[in-house]
Amino acid sequence: MGTNTSSLRPEEVEEMQKGTNFTQKEIKKLYKRFKKLDKDGNGTISKDEFLMIPELAVNPLVKRVISIFDENGDGSVNFKEFIAALSVFNAQGDKQRKLEFAFKVYDIDGDGYISNGELFTVLKMMVGNNLSDVQLQQIVDKTILEADEDGDGKISFEEFAKTLSHQDLENKMTIRL
């Protein structure tokens, strides 16, 4: 892929258009942004380079977001991974993909369920020391009790989706280009 060259080839842009909701113009704009973020010019964005983005640096879930962007698990994000992940947040992105992304934030081990421990870990990232561990555990227990319909002590994707069914994910998980 042409991430090390100065521009994307037309066939690369066309291929990315098929898998995302981005226009050719948006893909080219995102590529320029990607190249600016790729400080060392190696064609990937490292975790350190991601942390230089002011909006992400202050996000308590930044490490979880980066790990989800990094589909192949090599510790950095190439342009194909970057555009695929951002397409979830496109205004034309569907609610299902937004739900799947949100679920992955909580499903740390990727087993398809959000356990008590995973929910505690992610919520701890968000609240820091603003709540005691006891208070946080009470919130986790209550959340699982309310969302866990089959009584297995964890939250499946279906249970997660149902719990968030009344949330406005289309707007809350959308970035404007």
Curated annotation (Swiss-Prot):
Database matches in PANTHER family: PROTEIN PHOSPATASE 3 REGULATORY SUBUNIT B ALPHA ISOFORM TYPE 1
Summary of subunit composition and partner proteins: Composed of a catalytic subunit (A) and a regulatory subunit (B).
GO MF terms held by the record: calcium ion binding
InterPro entries: EF-hand-dom_pair (IPR011992), EF_Hand_1_Ca_BS (IPR018247), EF_hand_dom (IPR002048)
EF-hand domain: residues covered: 25-60, 62-92, 94-129, 135-170
Ligand binding (Ca(2+) 3): D107, D109, D111, Y113, E118
Family annotation (CDD domains): EFh
Alphabetical keyword list: Calcium, Metal-binding, Repeat
Database matches in Gene3D superfamilies: EF-hand
Name of this chain's protein: Calcineurin subunit B
Residue sites binding Ca(2+) 4 per the record: D148, D150, D152, K154, E159
Chain sites annotated for binding Ca(2+) 2: D70, N72, D74, S76, E81
Annotated function: Regulatory subunit of calcineurin, a calcium-dependent, calmodulin stimulated protein phosphatase. Confers calcium sensitivity.
Gene, per the UniProt record: CNB1
Additional observations: This protein has four functional calcium-binding sites.
Positions contributing to Ca(2+) 1 binding: D38, D40, N42, T44, E49
Family affiliation: Belongs to the calcineurin regulatory subunit family.
